[in-house]
Regions:
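Catalytic machinery of carbohydrate-active enzymes
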Residues: 1-349
């Protein structure tokens, strides 16, 4: 049996779709599961266990000079799909573009969300009813799998690489215990206070001897440099230096992670990283880390969740009020509680 998953973006949503591959293969051991995904997330599709990956380059459309390249990239992928003879095409994106790719796959059966945008449901044979505005992305994906007779069981897939030693050695972390911190998101309102991240790193090193590993894209270098300056000899700045395989390896070996609501949070959740998720303007029921090895901290302000990219109540240039409400002491306490809970759970297993 052959399946095509269509989930091009975004980072967090792609990470939440990773279990779909494993669950299909567990239910149908001889199945071939392919994935159509944006170029920058192809590494995650590979880590998820996809057999064949069809890569589209969405970023090529951003520059007029690259439009011919982008057009032929899309055309090339579209031309290949009908010859794969898929039994099922599963559109987890729910947009016009993904719906068109679903139709072009010529699968025997197309499945997608009933509330898909941009008229995408017209391309589906089966329309799955789930309120995606109020439901976690992972649970939405599980609802789609129910149409294939696949139910979630107690054994949840983990995407930690089998070999992490080479990654640890390449970054000078072999033999070290460390935690991961994510200092930057695309929304200013989601960013935690750099001084607070530095304070948490200092305290965790004093208590446990852990190093702090800062991760993110190249755009995080400035804030990472600030954190490193605030806590000398505590943090290792790996912003812009890891591919997805390396990031998953680091996530699998980290003692824990401290992160706001951002794509890497969901990738770490897929790797099974214990984490403290600091949630600001978004609803943790929908956007928080999925799984039972995390704790969520969120302010009790009545304005939440506001979904504003900039805090409309705070001062310009300063962290959003809801994120500033979360103190380093609260995070360190949450780390200790989570580790104790996981230790107790392991001892009782």
């Amino acid at each position: 049996m052959k399946f095509l998953i269509i989930k091009p973006s975004s980072l967090g949503d792609v990470a939440c779709a990773m279990p779909v591959v494993a669950l299909i293969k567990k239910h149908y051991p001889d199945a071939t599961v392919d994935w159509l995904v944006n170029k920058e997330y192809a590494g995650l599709a590979k880590a998820a266990g996809a057999d064949n990956i069809f890569v589209i380059d969405r970023r090529a459309w951003k520059k007029v000079a690259s439009w011919p390249k982008a057009f032929f990239n899309y055309l090339s992928v579209a031309a290949k799909l009908p010859f794969q003879h898929y039994d099922y095409a599963i559109d987890l994106q729910g947009l016009l573009r993904s719906g068109i790719f679903t139709a072009l796959s010529n699968a025997k059966k197309a499945i997608g969300f009933a509330d898909g945008r941009e008229c995408s449901p017209i391309f589906y044979d089966t329309k799955v009813v789930v309120n995606r505005k109020l439901t976690h992305s992972t649970l939405c994906n599980l609802a789609v799998l129910k149409e294939l007779g696949i139910e979630k069981d107690e054994t949840w897939p983990s995407f930690a690489p089998s070999d992490t030693s080479s990654t640890l050695e390449s970054f000078g972390l072999a033999g070290s215990e460390f935690f991961i911190a994510v200092p930057l998101t695309r929304w200013k309102s989601k960013n935690w206070v750099p001084e607070s991240i530095a304070a948490v790193g200092t305290e965790l090193k004093a208590r446990h001897g852990w190093r702090g590993v800062l991760v993110g894209g190249s755009d995080a270098k400035e804030v990472c440099a600030k954190i490193c300056a605030l806590s000398p000899d505590v943090f290792l700045d790996l912003s812009g230096k890891t591919d997805w395989s390396q990031f998953l390896a680091l996530s699998a070996e980290a003692r824990c992670a401290v992160t706001p609501d951002t794509g890497p949070m969901h990738v770490m959740a897929a790797a099974g990283t214990p984490m403290i998720a600091i949630m600001g303007p978004t609803d943790p029921r929908r956007h928080g880390p999925y799984g039972d090895c995390s704790k969520v901290l969120q302010s009790k302000r009545r304005c939440l969740p506001c979904y504003h990219r900039d805090c409309v109540l705070g001062e310009e240039g300063k962290p959003s009020l809801c994120m500033a409400d979360i103190t380093p002491e609260m995070v360190v306490e949450a780390v200790e509680e989570l580790l104790n809970e996981l230790k107790t759970k392991e001892e009782n297993a």
